[in-house]
């Protein structure tokens, strides 16, 4: 067996918006909003399991923070930001699985983390997967920060991406 084999879903995972298949209108709309700097506080991606919601959320996070800018998103040789976001280990792009972290304390931890500006990129991004699993109290705790996210000294802001 080959030591460099890769699961097909990972091998063909979209790296830039042009790679996304079946969601061209959504891809173009979000790409244009980022390009024109008309970025909403939050995005909500819905769909059946395996459709690519979390992958698309990472694409948006990369587009917001790529060192090359949204027009020249990294495809082959990834900048530090894009590489870290792709590997899910960027300090300013936080992914939370709301299926396992459903409580108010988990959301309060997010809110506390949002008080500090991004360390190396413009936008701090919170990707909350399975957001529908948050308890009512947890979502209520998140609501104020969602409606009025902090703006940071570097001109950036906090952006939420929800997947359900």
Q: Where would I find each of the regions flagged by the language model?
A:
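P-loop/Walker A NTP-binding region and its immediately flanking N-terminal helices
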Residues: 1-163
